[in-house]
Amino acid sequence: MADKSTEVEKAIDPIIDLGNLLFIDREPLQGDAEEGLEERARKNTQLLFNNIWQLEQKRVEEAIIVTLPAATYRLPREKKLPEKKEPTKWEKYAKEKGIEKRKKDKKVFDEATKEWKPTYGYRRGNDNTKDWLIEIPDNAEDPNKDFFAERREKKKERVAKNEMQRMKNLARQMKTTVKTGPSTDKMIGVGIDAKDKSKQDVRFAVDRAKLATASAGKFQEGLKGEKANIKTGKKRKFESNEAPVSAEKERALQILQRMKSKKAKIVEEKASAVAGPLREKKEKQEKKGAKEATRQKSQIHRQQWFKNKVDSKKKGTGGAKKKGANKRK
């Protein structure tokens, strides 16, 4: 197999993010995709490595390494990237004085057993805590005291001092890493501002927050007048296609009984909207009826007055005729 060239040319410039080692090929596929995918993958990988070797290089223990630049794509992740730790008090002092850390051997020769043993840890070499005899120094203030107990106490003091220094370093780092005030981090993911969300978007967000509990919202208490969850995540359960006739008949009877027992629901807004013009029409009819009633009453009184007038005239003419007749006789 002939060696292939390391020089790669692209008709359309790809998107390269060296911080994430990301390469996006924007050229469209032509022809059979399966045949060209392998060659395209090789060229894209070669072009990515060509860009990597253009960065600043340095040699560390017979290996060449490069420092990747900052990533341009912000990928979502569970936890944020670890920040550079604040140097401890000793590290600052060593840097100022030029003290370099020496690499110690992992094994040490034990003079007592004439063997190579670990420098630190279990069964380490030259372990003075295993001595059965301690030589009393010449300048000892009290030669009769317990030197074994004194050694144990000094070790406890050293451990406590190291722990105190470790806690101080952590507190010093916390002061520099803890941010105060509003967050200045960029939002991860594509979305809209909370103020621009619709009522339905807010509702979905509330439902998702309710389910984000250890029991998946099963024991979450609801507020008074709160609506039920829109998406419960439960699958619909359908009845069997083959069911006995008695069960279907009983279900139909239950529906009829429920329809009979329920009262008609009246929507106040619709009822007031419909009843408004009807009420006005009824009031107009009542006013008109009252006027007609008074008019009819006056007509009746007028008819009665005329009737009484006619009757009185008839009575008067009849009495005069009778008197004249009597005179003639």
Curated annotation (Swiss-Prot):
What protein name does the entry list?
Answer: Ribosome biogenesis regulatory protein homolog
Subcellular location(s) per record: Nucleus, Nucleolus
> What are the start and end residues of every segment in region (Disordered)?
227-248, 262-329
* InterPro entries to which the protein is assigned, alphabetical: Ribosom_reg
List the biased-composition ranges (Basic residues).
320-329
Free-text function comment from the UniProt entry = Involved in ribosomal large subunit assembly.
Q: Which domain of life is it from?
A: Eukaryota
- A single GO BP: endonucleolytic cleavage in ITS1 to separate SSU-rRNA from 5.8S rRNA and LSU-rRNA from tricistronic rRNA transcript (SSU-rRNA, 5.8S rRNA, LSU-rRNA)
Give start-end positions of Basic and acidic residues composition bias.
278-295
Q: Which family does it belong to?
A: Belongs to the RRS1 family.
Q: Which UniProt keywords apply?
A: Nucleus, Ribosome biogenesis
Native organism taxonomy = Eukaryota, Metazoa, Ecdysozoa, Nematoda, Chromadorea
Q: Does the keyword Oxidoreductase apply?
A: no
Q: Name one GO cellular component term.
A: nucleolus
